[in-house]
Amino acid sequence: MSTKIEQLEFQAETRQLLDLMIHSVYSNKDSFLRELISNASDALDKLRLEAFRNKELHVDTSDLHVEIEVDAEKRTLTVRDNGIGMSHDEVVDLIGTLAKSGTADLRRKLKEAKDAAASEELIGQFGIGFYSTFMVADKVTLLTRKAGESEATRWESSGEATYTIEAVDDAPQGSSVTLHLKPEDAEDHLHDYTSERKIKELVKRYSDFIAWPIRMNVERTVPAEGDGEDEVTTTSETINSMKALWARSKDDVSEDEYKEFYKHIAHAWDDPLEVIPMKAEGTFEFQALLFIPSHAPFDLFMRDGKTGVQLYVKRVFIMDDCDQLMPEYLRFVKGVVDAQDLSLNVSREILQQDRQIRAIRRRLTKKVLTTIKDLKTERPDDYRTFWAEFGRAVKEGLMSDTDNRDVLLGISSFASTHSEEELTSLEDYVARMKDGQEQIFYATGESRQLLESSPHMEAFRAKGFEVLLLTDPVDEMWVGAVPEFDGKSFQSIAKGEVDLDTEEDKKAHESEREEQEKDFAGLLSWMADALSEQVKEVRLSTRLTTSPACIVGDAFSMSPALERMYRASGQPVPVTKRILELNPTHPLVTGLREAHGERNEDPALGETAELLYGMALLAEGGELEDPARFTTMLANRLARTV
């Protein structure tokens, strides 16, 4: 049948959209194939539903599929389906008009009808993905015949102001979209889309879990027997797995399948530590399959490190590294989230900040934290492995996630003076606290060895008080952000004044303490003047037993390590002076007191004060402001003793 070819103009909005599609909307030109396959999958879903509802529609639904065909010589790529197809009017309405989506209309009708049997996985809700083809094609041809009708429609456009449309005979049911591809251009990210390898790569990345088979004719060389020539054969091959493990019941998935899937999406060589399947129903429906890895990735603490969660919408891949679905401190979690309905931008590549995303994020976070809690209780060995790999990252949440802070404190573990081998929970620490103890004592520093040998530790060790030993950089941050645990506040052993005595001890030592304050008043005043550039105060210590001196901060001052971290990151840090504490029972301090009383004008006493301050600074792992001066004074002092 010969028919008239109509030439029509795009609406003004559509012309603007085409320009946006080609130059602005999509960050990756490869996305066009995802859009075409999504539309084809949508058409197959529609046909299956229509055949179920309309008993007068006699169509074969036994082999519904998507087919990809390439012609390297003609530089064409065709995506074909045997789905519902479109009529002439629908082609004009859906393709010639901006963002008019047949799928969106169908879903609205189904929702109004409340037909439970029609809960189909329809994904063509965006309405304009078809236009993405003009990013890679100079001309696009659509051939489509609606199921149950005899006449087909051919639509063709070069992406300019007009398109042509005509009625044709002898077209198969369904739709085929043929792209006349632009030349390859590496700078413009135009690849060889007739390459079998490239097509398989894109299908694997974007459409591997589409429920329908995606087929492609592939050439294979069959070696000849004897001296004959090798034979080249063409066979149809299904190039997608169709295995959306997250959509299956946990009982129907084997452990090996989970492991294989994890290695596929995480690009991992080892097995996951934990598998977390999840299905949420209600206001926001989604399915998720998450994994806790066995080992931390090398870039876990790098600024540009990637998150591990992929986002799908109705089995269609949307994006890698979807940081909006998981808090940053859980960035090590790998997996897939498949949402039923999300507000996306027109390219499906950027999520809009809306309550759906926030709701999904809350559910995922709660599920992961509950899993870690169960791991700690039921599988302590696996928990220890997890904490060694990811504990530093989890503790970041103590600062940022106030809603889940109590849960995070509960699943955290810390080194302490209670055991050299085992970590402790805060719950166990509190259970071991002494009668009358109202604070959780902690020390921060670069290593356990440095902390245990610190002068600040002496009184706590002598009196049997347990101290948390915090050696991760993040520890310097969260202890200042978390007010308390189980009604017990956190107290640094290197800040403020320490009161470890019982009421009986205080009464017994009260007169002795008053006598010491009186005896050392002159020395303390003199040293405060002599070291006024370095310290804000010199006082007697209640935390020292064997060391002559130590340096402490005010109760709410920033630790030296935290100051160094801020300076290293380029942030301004105000200059703060700390407090020098003296041990009133140490021979060096008592000798200095006596010497000061006898010859307070002796210049050597000033050097002794500087040496005492420098020794205290080094003992806590600090840095001398003038190491050369310190070593010169120390060498001169040692020379006089030889």
UniProtKB/Swiss-Prot annotation:
User: Segment B: which positions?
Assistant: 349-564
Where is this protein found? Cytoplasm
- Pfam families in the record: HATPase_c_3 (PF13589), HSP90 (PF00183)
Ribosomal protein listed as a keyword? no
Q: Which CDD domains match?
A: HATPase_Hsp90-like
SMART domains assigned to the protein according to its UniProt record, in alphabetical order: HATPase_c
Region (C) residue spans:
565-642
Q: Which UniProt keywords apply?
A: ATP-binding, Chaperone, Cytoplasm, Nucleotide-binding, Stress response
| Protein's UniProt keywords contain RNA-binding | no
Q: Which InterPro entries match?
A: HATPase_C_sf, HSP90_C, Hsp90_fam, Hsp90_N, Ribosomal_Su5_D2-typ_SF
Question: Where do the record's region annotations for A lie?
Answer: 1-348
GO CC entries: cytoplasm
The molecular function terms in GO held by this entry are: ATP binding; ATP hydrolysis activity; ATP-dependent protein folding chaperone; unfolded protein binding
Give the record's family classification.
Answer: Belongs to the heat shock protein 90 family.
What's its job? Molecular chaperone. Has ATPase activity.
Q: How does it assemble?
A: Homodimer.
Report the protein name in the record.
Chaperone protein HtpG
Recorded source organism is Rhodococcus jostii (strain RHA1)
Gene giving rise to this polypeptide? htpG
